């Protein structure tokens, strides 16, 4: 039986819902969804430059889980940029679901 999922504390949302290459309609692109907790990890780790221990404590998760979320977020962002895909960002509604 899997462990129960911990409720994560999220404090931010993206200022927009989609990043995509210029000049290509969104309907023609493959979309990658950045989850709310991955977005939060990216902001705390890379924008605010918190240590993994500090950021994990703010989110109410383990350092290992924070590292996993950060690695996933970085991979999704890098994939979207290098392969010309659309990156869907979490909305306030998505934040409430995490």
UniProtKB/Swiss-Prot annotation:
It comes from the Bacteria. Belongs to the UPF0251 family. Transmembrane segments: none annotated. This is UPF0251 protein Sbal_3699. It holds the Pfam family DUF134. InterPro entries: RNA_pol_sigma_r3/r4-like, UPF0251, WH-like_DNA-bd_sf.
